[in-house]
Amino acid sequence: MPPPEISKRVLDSKLEACKFAFLKLSAVKTTRMKNYKQLRTLLMLKEISRRGADRDFLKDPENSVTRILCSVLKQVVSNSDRSLKSLRGFQYETLDDQEKQQVTRMIASVQGMGSRKYEPETVDHLEDMTEPIEMEIYLGNGDGGDFGDIVLEPISWPLESQLTLEWVETLMGLLNQSTWKNSVSEFSLILPHSVAVSLVDCASQILEKEANCVKINGCSEDSRVIVVGDLHGQLHDLLKIFDQSGRPSQNQCFVFNGNYIGRGSWSLEVFLVLLAWKIMMPENVILLRGSSETRVSAEELDFLKDICDRYGEHGPMLYSKCIDCFKMLPLASVISNSVYTTHGGLFQSCGVHEESPNPSLLLGSLEELDKIERRQAGENDDENITLNHVLWSCPWMADGLSESNYKGLLWGADCTETFLQQSNLKMIIRSHEGPDARADREDMGNMLSGYSIDHEVESGKLCTVFSASMFSQGSRNYENEGAYAVLEPPNFTEPVFVSYTVENVPRLQHQIISDGSSTQQQQMWENRTGHGFASMGISNPPSWTVPLPNDPSQILQLREPPQVFEGLPLPDNIQEPHKSNYDYLFRLISALKQEIQTRV
């Protein structure tokens, strides 16, 4: 049996889930049922959810899953009159002759239930009562399902912008269902553009008022904090985390370390779900900024295209608001005066230190972090040195503080010790690196379990947590687990890392466009590099579109690969415009390989 403080949280979470499920099941119209199996499943689920909302019943340790099922079955028997009334109220005109006979047989079956006795040892043999569930309803378990034929009702913005638990749960359910439709063409019908804009606007107003480093104090004895790493647009990992750990509540705070958008198919969905929770529980949901939440990274990740695929001509406006919202995200948190969390890591001091011959490589402090003007960042966030370091820095095994070959800094265990000691902290939990980043760093943890203990020093530890399971980069899937950290009192400095895998997820098909003359990718590349094939006298360069063989009028738009392993980097002696065009070709080849892999 789990510890009392955990069981209480789990109980509260299950009660809320059961109440919400019962409300949803009660709203289902029987006229939408395709056959008697679905109708029977509806009645069973409704009774299970009603029974599950009974706190006295659930908290009894004798009520195992088997006993709960027995009790539910007995309850169905005792309420057979009510069940029969529901069955007899079914509208037969929607059924064919065979289905009418099936409903008739079901009525007879329910009438005979009063003579049955259900005991724990016999429940496993009740095949007629435990057929596969085929409900057209989302119960919030994050496991997905086949929702391809469902007509989803749009969600509307609540009056006075007061988000409730039911509203946020409904949003998560709708977005989860929409991911199984293999297309985002109807996304705006489910989540209207005005609702998405309202989410971003309301959350931005809350985030703007928060400090660069959010202090999480006042945690009670029965509270805990969940720290989540990179999600990279993988909505189903987020749903899995909520399903396993429970929702945000007064006794359970969530800290998200950034990188909400990425190469996953559902970047906008992940970001909007988190903004909804932030609006509902601003003090118990902390959203930090990641390296993906910058204008430059968003462009490289085709975030604008993702939004325009969903909202068409209204996409650029929402994209602009998301970019502005990114600037409002805090940069770090301190939990119970003991644990520092951030996306990338440590940063250099911007002050002048006369005692140091090389002040640019002095370690920065929490006091300096608080002084960063994060909300006034320019078009290129890379120009803000401290911000760049917070988002991009990485630990390594050598001592000292050094400039990285890419972005940010590299810092050793001695810097971790200095930062913890000077800040009076015991632990650092950062993110930013997954199995792809650690693939060529044999001296560091490989992140295949979703986390790594990188430094252990006298004052404490440095950990990395990554929450996108089965992470893919280019043509490689790392088959890694995702993870999150659970911190509990009294000092929150002994995290328990929970690893998981989400394998059964929908795959979004690449966008099909009707105009084969599209040169969007080529134009974006020319704008980015300042060079193009035209400068070499080539008027018909290779495009990023492929006519489909079964219908030449339908064009497949390839996505730029997240990382290219073959052919790059190019030798330094290759001159422009040849260098940019070679780069373009290698990326195109990688995109084609990626497309082939997803279709085999």
Curated annotation (Swiss-Prot):
It comes from Arabidopsis thaliana. Belongs to the PPP phosphatase family. PP-7 subfamily. It holds the Pfam family Metallophos. PANTHER family: SERINE/THREONINE-PROTEIN PHOSPHATASE 5-RELATED (PTHR45668), SERINE_THREONINE-PROTEIN PHOSPHATASE 7 INACTIVE HOMOLOG (PTHR45668:SF14). Mn(2+) binds at residues 230, 232, 343, 432. The lineage of its organism: Eukaryota, Viridiplantae, Streptophyta, Embryophyta, Tracheophyta. It comes from the Eukaryota. GO terms for cellular component: cytoplasm; cytosol; nucleus; plastid. Keywords: Manganese, Metal-binding. SUPFAM superfamilies: Metallo-dependent phosphatases. GO terms for molecular function: hydrolase activity; metal ion binding. SMART domains: PP2Ac (SM00156). Its cofactor is Mn(2+). One of its GO terms (biological process) is plastid translation. This is Serine/threonine-protein phosphatase 7 inactive homolog.
